[in-house]
Amino acid sequence: ALSSRLGIMAEGQLLTVGTAQQIKEKHGSSQELVLRLRPESEEALSQVMRDMSSELEASSVMAMLESTPWRRAAYYRPRCIVRLQLEQRGCVEASVLAEWWLQQAKGHAIEEFLQSLAGDRVELAEDFGLYWRFRLPRSGLSLPQLFQQLEENSARLGMDEYTVSQATLEQIFNSITE
């Protein structure tokens, strides 16, 4: 016989029982927003690159980052293309830096927008080029309200596409058993 009920056990203790949806509603504390940014236009990239030489050394890049603390923080996140190029080559191509610079500006604007909707518990889970993933507190905004706001503001914020989903059972298991 098939069953629709699940249980989560850890160290011999049954921690929760219910259908997958019941467990997600009871223990899932966040929703996940995954989005793809609209690629930068050649005009926008050219405008940013006008003030740069074709390659920039680490000291020049670090001086530029000092002007915006959120960009400096983004530089130290895993898989930052600018940091990786500097570590491997000692310099970064202006085109790579310009594209990253503009992507970070869009991502930061989206993060601030989400915080205005759902509060300060909005968390950037990762960013990798055009792809960004945020965790949103479930209590901040209903799903229909969130979709309405995303639809109304996606063009202005430079989003090409997005998805919103509940926490996965694996994420819930990990949070319950920690």
Task: Walk through the language-model features, giving the residues of each.
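Phosphate-coordinating loops and pocket residues in cytosolic domains that bind phosphorylated ligands
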Residues: 25
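Short glycine-/polar-rich loops that comprise or flank the Walker A/P-loop
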Residues: 4, 29-32
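ABC ATPase "signature
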Residues: 17-18
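Short, charged/small-residue-rich alpha-helical element at the C-terminal edge
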Residues: 32-171, 175-176
